[in-house]
Amino acid sequence: MIKSLNISAIYSSPINRAMQTAEIVGKHCDVKPILDDRLIELDMGKFTMMPYDEIFASHGNVFLKFYEGSLEISHNGVESFSEVQKRVFDIVDFVKNKHKGENVVLVTHMDPIKAMIGKVLSLKSEILFQLIIANASLNVFKYDDQNFYLSSINSMNSSRFHESF
């Protein structure tokens, strides 16, 4: 099924779980994944490896603060949401220029996906915080030479969208 989507390139976060997904997709469409650091997950700064309960107890809801752009987040070494959006759209711009009119897969993580969705749909921080991105789900964005559109979110079956590619 995936081979018929004519995937011309796969770009992946270098984080292991993303690379594994990219390799699986690549085997099915005969495309070798390209690793790109712009697709990595959010850098949690001093909160890296801390249990969520500890983070919330000492700093409140840091995830909502992250989407709101709170200075408390950056003071703790956490990458800001605007920084995540900038690096995500940096690779998206690169891909859309290099692969004009082609189907390209980006294998990434929740916050980079939310960065793209948030910008495309102009979502507020409260909505982004509540939005769940399912593991291994397909989120389809289309570009018409002027604008991006969200065609699918959290899809687990690409056959439903096969005709739209």
Language-model-detected regions and their locations in the chain:
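Amphipathic, non-transmembrane alpha-helical scaffold segments
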Residues: 15, 56, 81, 85-89
